[in-house]
């Protein structure tokens, strides 16, 4: 059984990696994939061996929460969490500005001791209320011998606070008596928390935008429906609808479930209504619905009203399947992300080790100010290290890319398919049902006596789509069961150079193998059962949404409508997404490689007296993760 479960409390890639590791270690869990930007876990498990409650308990033990209760609204939980984060961030800025004002002597409170004690109280209040989650999560991580971003924040702020407390009460007697100048660093501990919270607030806002495609799809689901019982019409929650119920849907209403039309009427036609299905199929023209027609949840009658019998409800509707497919795709991981996840598990412990080495080097080599400088350098290293930027680099770009594809009416099943599409340079395409639409009004027993144009029609924009693909360097091979003359005619009509007539299903499979042996990355586009072998064999398999269920089950990519221009769009989107991932990873890697040594004071080795302070380290760390998300969001606005 596969299930997408919302996760609350993740802050960095180490968080998602720890949750994934914990879930995969549980008996009964076959596999788990946790998405940081998606705030969810895709879990394949055996419900006879392990329950959702058990998984929730195990994840809660390491500091996170799985939302499995049906009565808990994920959206409401996330809204509450965001409001709390915003409140803590604003209050933390108040504490930070007060402590900074006291530190800079903009506010004068008695003598030095009094000022330090007031700063102590303000910093402590900030840690207890605004920074509490860092310490709680870090403690839970410590109990399970793991670490994440919260561990780094808790260590850095805890050390700077405790060192400041020591100096507040014993600084003069320990350091002053030896002629060593001493300071407190409450401003550093407060500003670290403030900048990290600010970064997370901005990051949450930005990550929220990466999930907009899912919210748009979920927005197609109405909350209520009109049920017809005993001649009366009553509005009821959609969750109470059962199979076989008769529902009334009026113009402008969203159809609540999948079903069959019982009766329809409109001013244009007495026994028909017209339904806008563009949000599902991409078709701009409303579809005529008469008695016996199938209707889909989320579509909208824009002319007339209809009564329908509910056939598929809840998670079994076509819309629910689309949402589930997009969620699973966004939770899937590209091969490079698997490597990043492994790095994330060791990144934080390595940073802690670098921080300890930095401390001892400065303590040994720092002269009179050895200890204070060693502590500040160690804190700066802890704060500036950012597993978030590396962890967000791939999944945010994938989420936006897969979401953008869904908006273009292209469903991509997993990250591997999206990544592989950019390499496609050969495409095998079935003719009937894919390039052409059979004419439903003809007698096919007499079809041989009819002109080719009368038997079937080239799909709108098919020629344009084929031209775009060929201009992009993709060689297209049309496969047809027709005679040579008919195959040549339709290939010419679509603008395709390579074609083959009188093909059998194994011929398609053989052509795919032949092209692959020539070193080409092959996409197969089909819609029928006879295409499934070739679809399964191809590097990228593309099915037409109006095709058979078997073809769509095998395919990695599904076109929800008949517009073949979606294929070149998807290939271009794949290239842009992979390019964005490379950009994100490059800058995240460069950030850590450059900034960690600068925070440790490496520039002193080259005679440059510059070092990143803990406060600036926290600001840079916050900016690095936000910038990765914002860079990925650029995909949404690319044509």
Residue ranges of predicted features:
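Flexible metal-binding regulatory segments at protein termini and peripheral loops
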Residues: 1-116, 216, 232-233, 270, ...
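Conserved cytosolic catalytic loops of P-type ATPases
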Residues: 4, 26-49, 53, 183-186, ...
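Conserved ATP-binding TGD loop and adjacent catalytic N/P-domain core of P-type ATPases
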Residues: 17, 38, 412, 422, ...
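Actuator/coupling domain of P-type ATPases
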Residues: 58-76, 117-119, 123-224, 242, ...
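Bilayer-spanning, highly hydrophobic alpha-helical transmembrane segments
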Residues: 90-98, 338-366, 378-386, 391-396, ...
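Membrane-embedded alpha-helical bundles of multi-pass transporters
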Residues: 108-111, 143, 162, 404, ...
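Juxtamembrane helix-loop transition segments at the membrane interface in multi-pass membrane proteins
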Residues: 139-144, 205-220, 396-415, 633-639
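Conserved catalytic phosphorylation-site environment of P-type ATPases
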Residues: 280, 376, 386-451, 534, ...
């Amino acid at each position: 059984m596969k299930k997408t479960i919302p996760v609350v409390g993740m802050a960095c890639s180490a968080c998602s990696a720890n949750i994934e590791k914990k879930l995969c270690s549980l008996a009964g869990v076959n596999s788990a994939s946790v998405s940081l930007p998606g705030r969810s876990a895709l879990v394949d498990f055996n419900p006879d061996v392990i329950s959702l409650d058990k998984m929730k308990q195990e994840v809660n033990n390491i500091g996170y929460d799985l939302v499995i209760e049906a009565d808990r609204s994920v959206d409401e939980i996330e809204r509450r969490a965001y409001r709390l984060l915003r409140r803590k961030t604003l209050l933390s800025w108040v504490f930070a500005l007060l402590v900074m004002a006291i530190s800079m002597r903009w506010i004068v409170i008695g003598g030095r001791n009094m000022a330090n004690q007031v700063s102590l109280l303000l910093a402590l209040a900030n840690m207890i209320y605004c920074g509490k989650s860092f310490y709680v999560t870090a403690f839970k991580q410590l109990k399970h011998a793991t670490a994440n971003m919260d561990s780094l924040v808790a260590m850095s702020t805890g050390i700077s606070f405790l060192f400041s407390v020591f100096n507040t009460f014993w600084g003069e007697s320990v350091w002053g008596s030896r002629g060593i100048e001493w300071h407190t660093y409450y401003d550093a501990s407060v500003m670290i928390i403030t900048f990290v919270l600010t970064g997370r607030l901005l990051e949450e806002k930005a990550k929220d935008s990466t999930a907009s495609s899912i919210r748009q799809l979920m927005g197609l689901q109405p909350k209520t429906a009109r049920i017809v019982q005993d001649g009366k019409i009553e509005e009821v929650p959609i969750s109470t609808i059962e199979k076989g119920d008769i529902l009334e849907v009026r113009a402008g209403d969203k159809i609540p479930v999948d079903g069959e039309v019982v009766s329809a009427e409109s001013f244009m036609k007495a026994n028909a209504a017209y339904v806008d299905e563009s949000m599902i199929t991409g078709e701009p023209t409303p579809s005529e619905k008469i008695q016996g027609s199938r209707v889909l949840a989320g579509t909208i009658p824009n002319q007339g009203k209809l009564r329908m019998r509910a056939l598929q409800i809840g998670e079994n509707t076509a819309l629910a399947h689309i949402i589930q497919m997009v969620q699973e795709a966004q939770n899937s991981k590209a091969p490079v992300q698997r490597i990043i996840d492994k790095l994330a598990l060791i990144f934080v412990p390595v940073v802690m080790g670098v921080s300890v080495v930095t401390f001892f080097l400065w303590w040994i080599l720092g002269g009179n100010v050895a200890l204070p400088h060693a502590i500040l350098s160690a804190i700066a290293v802890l704060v500036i290290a950012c597993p978030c930027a590396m962890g967000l680099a791939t999944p945010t770009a994938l989420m936006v890319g897969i979401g953008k594809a869904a908006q273009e009416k292209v469903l991509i099943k997993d990250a591997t398919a999206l990544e592989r599409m950019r390499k496609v340079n050969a495409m095998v395409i079935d003719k009937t049902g894919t390039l052409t639409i059979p004419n439903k009004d003809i007698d096919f027993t007499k079809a041989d006596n009819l002109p080719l144009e009368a038997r079937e029609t080239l799909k709108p924009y098919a020629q344009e789509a084929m031209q775009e693909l060929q201009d992009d360097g993709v060689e297209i091979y049309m496969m047809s069961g027709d005679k040579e003359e008919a195959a040549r005619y339709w290939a010419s009509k679509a603008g395709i150079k390579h074609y083959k007539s009188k093909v059998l299903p194994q011929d398609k499979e053989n052509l795919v193998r032949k092209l692959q042996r020539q070193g080409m990355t092959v996409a197969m586009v089909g819609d029928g059962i006879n295409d499934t072998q070739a679809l399964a064999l191809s590097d990228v398999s593309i099915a037409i949404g109006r095709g058979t269920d078997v073809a769509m089950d095998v395919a990695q990519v599904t076109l929800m409508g008949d517009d073949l221009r979606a294929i070149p769009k998807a290939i271009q989107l794949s290239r842009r997404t992979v390019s964005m991932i490379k950009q994100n990873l490059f800058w995240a890697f460069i950030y850590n490689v450059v900034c960690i040594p600068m925070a440790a004071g490496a520039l002193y080795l080259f005679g440059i007296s510059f070092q990143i302070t803990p406060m600036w380290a926290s600001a840079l760390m916050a900016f690095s993760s936000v910038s990765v998300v914002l860079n990925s969001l650029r995909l949404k606005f690319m044509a």
